[in-house]
Amino acid sequence: RPSFCNLPVKPGPCNGFFSAFYYSQKTNKCHSFTYGGCKGNANRFSTIEKCRRTCVG
């Protein structure tokens, strides 16, 4: 799995409400979170399928 999968979930400082998904190393699963729309990090996916395909394997 790519190293960015191990980054912590980071909603970012902006106030948008965008549905996104991140990989949790602790649970070895993808979870939903609300992305604010700016900054954040690479551990953010638009669909749970993309998250699973990239980080869970």
Curated annotation (Swiss-Prot):
CDD domains, sorted: Kunitz_dendrotoxin (cd22595)
Disulfide bonding pattern of the chain: C5-C55, C14-C38, C30-C51
Keyword Secreted: yes
All residue ranges annotated as the BPTI/Kunitz inhibitor domain in the record: 5-55
InterPro entries: Kunitz_BPTI, Kunitz_BPTI_sf, Prtase_inh_Kunz-CS, TFPI/VKTCI-like
Protein's cellular compartments: Secreted
GO molecular function: serine-type endopeptidase inhibitor activity; toxin activity
Alphabetical UniProt keywords: Disulfide bond, G-protein coupled receptor impairing toxin, Secreted, Toxin
Tissue: Expressed by the venom gland.
Region (Important for binding V2R): 15-16
GO cellular component, one term: extracellular space
Family assignment from sequence similarity: Belongs to the venom Kunitz-type family.
PANTHER family: BOOPHILIN-H2, KUNITZ-TYPE PROTEASE INHIBITOR-RELATED
Misc: Negative results: shows a weak inhibition on trypsin (PRSS1) (IC(50)=14.8 uM) and Kv1.1/KCNA1 (IC(50)=8.2 uM). Does not interact with vasopression V1a, V1b and the oxytocin receptors. Does not show activity on potassium (except Kv1.1), sodium, and calcium (Cav1.2) channels. Does not show agonist and antagonist activities on the 156 GPCR tested. Does not activate pathways of the vasopression V2 receptor.
Domains (record comment): Exploits its two major loops and engages more positions in its interaction with V2R. The pharmacophore defined by numerous amino acids positioned in loop 1 (9 to 18) and loop 2 (34, 39 and 44) may be at the origin of the absolute selectivity of this protein for V2R.
Name of the featured protein: Mambaquaretin-1
Organism: Dendroaspis angusticeps
Taxonomic path: Eukaryota, Metazoa, Chordata, Craniata, Vertebrata
